[in-house]
């Protein structure tokens, strides 16, 4: 599974500005989804890879980013 890492309190994606390989995104993806996860910056959001199937990713149901 893959997807954008999401802030559970705001419903927002984690923003990033350095596209491609991005240490911040990799660190955040691993922190939220476990050390097996990968991550990089795609379309100015942190995109996480190698997630478990039940991983919660953006968008959150009934929670819009504002």
From Swiss-Prot:
Signal peptide: none
Positions of the LCN-type CS-alpha/beta domain: 1-66
Molecular functions per Gene Ontology: calcium channel regulator activity; sodium channel inhibitor activity; toxin activity
Keywords annotated in UniProt: Calcium channel impairing toxin, Disulfide bond, Ion channel impairing toxin, Neurotoxin, Secreted, Toxin, Voltage-gated calcium channel impairing toxin
GO terms under cellular component: extracellular space
Single GO biological process annotation from the record: envenomation resulting in negative regulation of voltage-gated sodium channel activity in another organism
Keyword match Cell division: no
Domain of life: Eukaryota
Cellular localisation: Secreted
Chief localisation class: secreted
SUPFAM superfamilies referenced in this protein's UniProt entry, alphabetically: Scorpion toxin-like (SSF57095)
Disulfide bonds: 12-65, 16-41, 25-46, 29-48
Entry keyword Secreted: yes
Activity regulation information from UniProt: Inhibited by human antibodies scFvs 10FG2 and LR.
Tissue expression notes: Expressed by the venom gland.
Family, as annotated: Belongs to the long (4 C-C) scorpion toxin superfamily. Sodium channel inhibitor family. Beta subfamily.
Function according to Swiss-Prot or TrEMBL: Beta toxins bind voltage-independently at site-4 of sodium channels (Nav) and reduces peak current and shifts the voltage of activation toward more negative potentials thereby affecting sodium channel activation and promoting spontaneous and repetitive firing. Has an inhibitory effect on voltage-gated sodium channel hNav1.6/SCN8A, affecting both the activation and inactivation processes. This toxin is active against mammals and lethal to mice.
Record note on domains: Has the structural arrangement of an alpha-helix connected to antiparallel beta-sheets by disulfide bonds (CS-alpha/beta).
Name of this protein: Beta-toxin Cb1
Organism field: Centruroides baergi (Scorpion)
């Amino acid at each position: 599974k893959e997807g954008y890492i999401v802030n559970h309190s705001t419903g927002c994606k984690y923003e990033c500005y350095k596209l491609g390989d991005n240490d911040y995104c990799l660190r955040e993806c691993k922190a939220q989804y476990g050390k097996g996860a990968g991550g990089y910056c795609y379309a100015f959001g942190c995109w996480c890879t190698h997630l478990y199937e039940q991983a919660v990713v953006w968008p959150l149901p009934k929670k819009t980013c504002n």
